[in-house]
Amino acid sequence: MAIAERRSRSHLALRVRDRVSAEVFFEERFEDGWESKWVKSDWKRDENMAGEWNFTSGKWNGDANDKGIQTSEDYRFYAISAAFPEFSNKGKTLVFQFSVKHEQKLDCGGGYMKLLSGDVDQKKFGGDTPYSIMFGPDICGYSTKKVHAILTKGETNHLIKKDVPCETDQLTHVYTFILRPDASYSILIDNVEKQSGSVYTDWDILPPKQIKDPEAKKPEDWEDKEYIPDPEDKKPEGYDDIPKEITDPEAKKPEDWDDEEDGEWTAPTIPNPDYKGEWKPKKIKNPNFKGKWKAPMIDNPDFKDDPDIYVFPKLKYVGIELWQVKSGTMFDNVLICDDPDYAKKLAEETWGKNKDAEKAAFDEAEKKKEEEEAKDDPTESDDEKPDEEGESDGEGDDESKDIDNEEDDEDVHDEL
């Protein structure tokens, strides 16, 4: 108890000291009493498909007192949210950060969070609830292993056009999304920038400033063929008289061939090595080649600049809404603020402080798992070993078993 109190006091000291320069809109470290701030949705509960959350530090960790919330049931939907005083990020930097750990070695499922605006019935929060920002890792099979960064404008969800690979191991990782007043952004994983750019270019929120002139047409005399037939090249005399096949000069009439019984003998034909097919003049560089024609660009009459493209004026909720085939994903240390430095310090104080101990705990858990699996493996005793005389037959049996096992594996793969 004394250790937990000292830990809370040290956290409080850091919060007070660093919050002087940062405006923190929401911060959740999932300590005792966290449930008073979070609302578990009834979404999918009537269908018995709503998953339950565990409050835990996980199977392996760097600090048993540092807990988060973890999905606990396979093949379930999860939805939970928390409210905070409504604010707009206009004229200020928006920082959205949280940590995720996929203890279950995730095959298919999300690890992302959402920011919502306006008034939301939190008990009905689910997959159809509109959101402003969706951010975080998503894994499914071999094809999807990326960080989502989706910005909603109007009723359209705009996906980031750049690839941002996510972490896929079973350890804790911190994901940070920074959106600035100049519409620039950064995506960090474990306090390391993985992607950056501009909202103007990396999301298709606005129509393009310029478009191809729809009225433009390629001039009739435009030469877009790089090579043309050589007008000086002439077909050789007698070219068309060259036969496709000729009589095989090596063929000889069989000695036992009887013209009366077998008919008149005819030598077989073979492809003519001198036959070159249909004659075509050789190609030369087109002296009038102008390149591939492109329609000229013109200003897009539908383009309208939006200096507030980065703005979300009524942010009010943070939520987790996802589907998981295999449960075990843990969320912790959720932060919404205006100061990237504060977010970085929070990440270092939590994830950074515990990552080495967590890795050691994970390695130890894996070692114990391997030892247990080794104990469970059947070993062949001496009295079960085949004698020398029957050794050949035994090898044949093993080979037959191997073939059967391979066929079983193929059947399982086909079923999947």
UniProtKB/Swiss-Prot annotation:
- Organism of derivation: Berberis stolonifera (Barberry)
- The residues bearing each sequence repeat, given as ranges, are 194-205, 213-224, 230-241, 248-259, 263-273, 277-287, 291-301
Report the sequence similarity comment from the record: Belongs to the calreticulin family.
Against InterPro entries, the record matches this protein to: Calret/calnex, Calret/calnex_CS, Calreticulin, Calreticulin/calnexin_P_dom_sf, ConA-like_dom_sf
Q: What is its main location?
A: endoplasmic reticulum
Gene3D superfamilies recorded? 2.60.120.200, Calreticulin/calnexin, P domain
Q: Where does an alpha-D-glucoside bind?
A: Y112, K114, Y131, D138, E321
Q: What does the domain comment read?
A: Can be divided into a N-terminal globular domain, a proline-rich P-domain forming an elongated arm-like structure and a C-terminal acidic domain. The P-domain binds one molecule of calcium with high affinity, whereas the acidic C-domain binds multiple calcium ions with low affinity. The interaction with glycans occurs through a binding site in the globular lectin domain.
Residues covered by region (4 X approximate repeats)? 194-259
For bias type Basic and acidic residues, the affected ranges are 210-255, 349-378
**Where is this chain's protein located in or outside the cell?**
Endoplasmic reticulum lumen
Q: Where is the composition biased (Acidic residues)?
A: 379-416
GO molecular function terms listed in the Swiss-Prot or TrEMBL record: calcium ion binding; carbohydrate binding; unfolded protein binding
Region (3 X approximate repeats): which ranges? 263-301
Q: Where is this motif: Prevents secretion from ER?
A: 413-416
Q: Where is this region: Disordered?
A: 209-281, 349-416
Q: Tell me, what does this protein do in biology?
A: Molecular calcium-binding chaperone promoting folding, oligomeric assembly and quality control in the ER via the calreticulin/calnexin cycle. This lectin may interact transiently with almost all of the monoglucosylated glycoproteins that are synthesized in the ER.
Could you give one GO CC term from the UniProt record? Answer: endoplasmic reticulum lumen
Identify the glycosylated residues: N54
Here the disulfide bonds are C108-C140
The record's Gene Ontology biological-process terms are: ERAD pathway; protein folding
Record keywords, A-Z: Calcium, Chaperone, Disulfide bond, Endoplasmic reticulum, Glycoprotein, Lectin, Metal-binding, Repeat, Signal, Zinc
Protein name as annotated: Calreticulin
Q: What is the lineage of its organism?
A: Eukaryota, Viridiplantae, Streptophyta, Embryophyta, Tracheophyta
